[in-house]
UniProtKB/Swiss-Prot annotation:
Organism: Vanderwaltozyma polyspora (strain ATCC 22028 / DSM 70294 / BCRC 21397 / CBS 2163 / NBRC 10782 / NRRL Y-8283 / UCD 57-17)
Protein name per Swiss-Prot or TrEMBL: Altered inheritance of mitochondria protein 24, mitochondrial
Family matches, as PANTHER family: ALTERED INHERITANCE OF MITOCHONDRIA PROTEIN 24, MITOCHONDRIAL
Superkingdom per UniProt: Eukaryota
Alphabetized UniProt keyword annotations: Mitochondrion, Transit peptide
Keyword Mitochondrion found: yes
Interval spanned by the transit peptide: 1-24
A Pfam family annotated for this UniProt entry: AIM24
InterPro entries membership: AIM24, AIM24_sf, Trp_RNA-bd_attenuator-like_dom
Keyword Mitochondrion on entry: yes
Length: 397
C-alpha cells in the first residue's frame, strides 16, 4: 500500500500580474484615406452642379460658383463648405417667400413657400437633405420617407412638377424660371379642364433643380409617339413637354374599374311609401319595405366611402415622346431592378452527378480503412469503400 500523500496547492496555477503606471502616451496612427469620394469640388468651378448621394438618395451635394444665388427650402441645409481659397469669403443668407398664394390655396399651408437664399463672392458647397417641417411644433410634424433626384434643364423642354415638397433647391440664374400654375384663370372657364391635378409648378429654361419625392424616384423615357405608360395619378411626380398644350394632349385617363356602384342606384319595389302609411302595410309589404331600405342604405354607404373617404383611384395614360418622373409612394423604398430578364437554370446534368458521386466515393475510400495484422506482426493498411468484402473474407477464414 502506497502511503504517499497528495498535497494540494490551491494557488499553484494562479498568475499574478503587476500593473505599472506609465506617463507616456502613444498616439494612434491617423489614416487620411477614408475610402469615400470627395463630396465637394469647388475649385475652379464655372457652373453649378447638383449630385444626389447614397442609395437610396437621401442627401445631395451642391457646388455653386461665385455670385450665383442658390435657393433652398428652409430646414434642408445639412452643412456648408468652403475651401482654403474661399475661407475669407462671406456667405450671405436671407429668407424669401415663393408662391405663397399658390401653396396657401393648394395645400392650405405656406411652409413650402419659405426658401433660404445663399450668395457668395467665392465658390462654395453644401449638403442638402429633405428635412421638411410641416408643423410649427416639430414633434407634431409627420415626415414621410423621401428621396432626392436632380433635374438638369437644357432649355429643350419644360417640366410640370407636382407635390407640396417637390422642389427642394434650385439655382437662381436668369435663364431658369419656376412658375406656379394659376388655380383661377378666367380664360380656362370655357375650356375643357385637364384630367390631371392643376396643383403643379412649371420649370422652364436652363439650370439645375433638386427635387424630392415620396419613396423612391425613377425616370421613364418614352422615346416615340407609340410609347405609352399608365401611371397611378398619385405616383406622378413630373412630366416633360414642349408646351403646356402638348403636355395636356399627351395625358388621358385610363379607366379600369366602372362606377356601377355609384351610378346604379337601387330602385325600391314599393314606391311612394310615406312614413304615415307604414301602419297600413301588410306583413309581406313590411318585409319588402325594409329590404328596399337596407339596399338603399348599403348603396349610400358604399357611394360615400368610394367617392369621399377612399377616393376613386385614377390612372393616367401618358404618351411619348417625353420623360416621366414617378414616385413609389410614402414610406416605400424599392431597390434598383435589373432591366434585362435573367433566367437561372436549376437543372444539373446527369454527368456532373455521376462525377460528384465518383468523387465522393473516392473521398470516402481515403478515410475508410481496415488494418490486417499477421501472426508475424506485420501491419497492413488498406482503403475500402465499405467493409462488406472484408467481413466475407473473415467469415470464410
Amino acid at each position: 500500500m502506497n502511503n504517499n500523500k497528495l498535497l494540494f496547492a490551491p494557488f499553484a496555477n494562479k498568475r499574478f500580474i503587476t500593473l505599472i503606471p506609465n506617463s507616456k502616451v502613444v498616439k494612434p496612427a491617423i489614416d487620411d484615406s477614408t475610402g469615400t469620394e470627395n463630396l465637394f469640388n469647388v475649385e475652379d468651378l464655372k457652373t453649378t452642379t447638383f449630385n444626389a448621394i447614397g442609395e437610396p438618395s437621401t442627401m445631395a451635394s451642391l457646388s455653386v460658383p461665385p455670385r450665383i444665388p442658390l435657393y433652398i427650402r428652409r430646414g434642408c441645409i445639412v452643412s456648408l463648405y468652403n475651401n482654403k481659397s474661399s475661407k475669407d469669403s462671406n456667405i450671405s443668407m436671407t429668407h424669401e417667400w415663393k408662391s405663397i398664394i399658390f401653396n396657401l390655396f393648394s395645400y392650405s399651408s405656406i411652409t413650402s413657400s419659405l426658401f433660404i437664399k445663399l450668395t457668395s463672392d467665392k465658390s462654395f458647397g453644401l449638403l442638402v437633405a429633405p428635412n421638411f417641417t410641416s408643423n410649427i411644433i416639430p414633434l407634431l410634424s409627420k415626415n414621410s420617407y423621401s428621396t432626392l433626384c436632380t433635374l438638369n434643364l437644357n432649355g429643350s423642354a419644360d417640366w410640370n412638377i407636382w407635390g407640396k415638397n417637390s422642389i427642394v433647391a434650385y439655382e437662381g440664374n436668369t435663364s431658369l424660371n419656376i412658375v406656379s400654375n394659376p388655380l383661377f384663370n378666367w380664360r380656362s372657364v370655357f375650356k375643357k379642364r385637364p384630367i390631371y391635378s392643376r396643383k403643379f409648378q412649371t420649370i422652364a429654361g436652363r439650370g439645375n433643380v433638386l427635387l424630392s419625392g415620396s419613396g423612391s424616384i425613377y425616370t421613364i423615357e418614352l422615346k416615340t409617339k407609340e410609347d405609352e405608360i399608365v401611371i397611378k395619378s398619385e405616383c406622378l411626380l413630373g412630366i416633360s413637354g414642349s408646351t403646356q398644350l402638348e403636355i395636356k394632349d399627351s395625358i388621358s385617363e385610363q379607366k379600369y374599374i366602372s362606377n356601377d356602384i355609384i351610378d346604379q342606384k337601387p330602385q325600391p319595389v314599393l314606391k311612394d311609401v310615406k312614413l304615415s302609411d307604414l301602419n297600413k302595410l301588410t306583413k309581406e309589404e313590411y318585409k319588402i319595405y325594409f329590404k328596399d331600405l337596407y339596399h338603399l342604405t348599403s348603396w349610400w354607404i358604399k357611394k360615400t366611402y368610394i367617392k369621399w373617404i377612399s377616393g376613386s383611384t385614377k390612372f393616367l395614360k401618358v404618351k411619348g415622346p417625353r420623360n416621366v418622373l414617378i414616385q413609389t409612394g410614402h414610406n416605400v423604398y424599392l431597390p434598383n431592378i435589373p432591366t434585362k430578364k435573367q433566367e437561372t437554370n436549376l437543372s444539373v446534368p446527369e454527368e456532373s452527378l455521376l462525377t460528384e458521386r465518383d468523387a465522393q466515393v473516392k473521398s470516402e475510400m481515403k478515410y475508410t480503412n481496415y488494418v490486417t495484422i499477421s501472426r508475424s506482426g506485420d501491419v497492413k493498411f488498406q482503403s475500402t469503400p465499405n467493409f462488406n468484402e472484408t467481413i466475407n473474407k473473415l467469415k470464410k477464414n
